[in-house]
Amino acid sequence: MALQSCCSSSASVPATCSALCLAEATRAASLFVRPRAAARRLVLARCARGREGGESKAVQLVLGGRARDDGSESESSDDEDDDEPMQMTDEQRRTLRRKIREMMDRVPETAEITDPAERKAKMLELLTKYQLVVEEEDPNWPEDDEDGHGFSLGQFFDKITIKAEKKNDDDEEDDAKGNQSDKEIVWEDDNYIKPIRDVKTMDWDDTVFTDFGPLIVLVHNRYKRPQDNENARDQLVKAIEMFWEYNLPSPRCVAVDACAEPDLVKALNVSGFPEVLFTNAGKIVHRDKVVRSAEEWTRMMAFFYYKAARPPCLSEADGQGQEKVPLMS
């Protein structure tokens, strides 16, 4: 009985030991497998993040953005911000391309001459038309008022005529002594004497009171009856030029812009446009508010200033005004 119990106890011990050994081995194996599985999952996660990061960089490069490096989480410098390309929307990109195409369409396409013989012929043609060097005694030199071949100063400016007078012996002696003669060059500047000169408020006193001779004042307005104002100025110009054609002295004539010089117009007591004031010796002798022809105004000037016959357009009371010309200083 005791042996049986011992055997039974001895038989139960190995079973218990084996069970304990197997349990210990299983626990150790599980502890060894878990770190490896965790490490494997960590590696797979890193690979997945690497693939996602690479895909985002490619997408950013395609869209025009700047791919961010792995260690670029820190603050970037101002230089890097300046180098960053400008991000544009699709609408802005289409607008920019359309403007570029419009600018390119404005420039006409020119065909380039590639044939050497044709290029040489074209060069010879240009040299023939526009010579680089011309002899002073060339019989074909143009005698008209031109600056070179084919370009005239009259296209851009009024003609300038300069007349050089011959010097006398006395003038040459003065030049030798260092005294310059006043008659070396005579300017024929009739082309620069305008029949009507525009005057401003700041120049009014010098224009009127420096010379008390005959003066005609045209007060015009570019916005009120513009056609009549322009016609009045044209007829006055023709009237003054008629004096010049007969080598007669013409009265001075100035124009006042009502839009630019309202204070002067108010001082002259002008309300309707155009209006022509005939002044003499600092007094307004007549106000004419009618747009007349050049011939009628010529006769009026001759009557007021040169004691000519009275024209039919004037009454006996006209020309007797004593209103003083205003002073603007």
Swiss-Prot record:
Residues 58-91 are annotated as: Disordered. Residues 1-46 form a transit peptide. InterPro entries: MRL7/MRL7L. GO terms for cellular component: chloroplast stroma. GO terms for biological process: chloroplast organization; regulation of DNA-templated transcription. It is found in: Plastid, Chloroplast stroma. Residues 72-85 have a biased composition (Acidic residues). It comes from the Eukaryota. The keyword Plastid applies. This is Thioredoxin-like fold domain-containing protein MRL7L homolog, chloroplastic. Keywords: Chloroplast, Plastid, Transit peptide. The lineage of its organism: Eukaryota, Viridiplantae, Streptophyta, Embryophyta, Tracheophyta. Plays an essential role in early steps of chloroplast development. Involved in the regulation of plastid gene expression. Required for the proper function of the plastid transcriptional machinery and protein accumulation in thylakoid membranes. May function as molecular chaperone to ensure proper organization of the nucleoids in chloroplasts. The keyword Amino-acid biosynthesis does not apply.
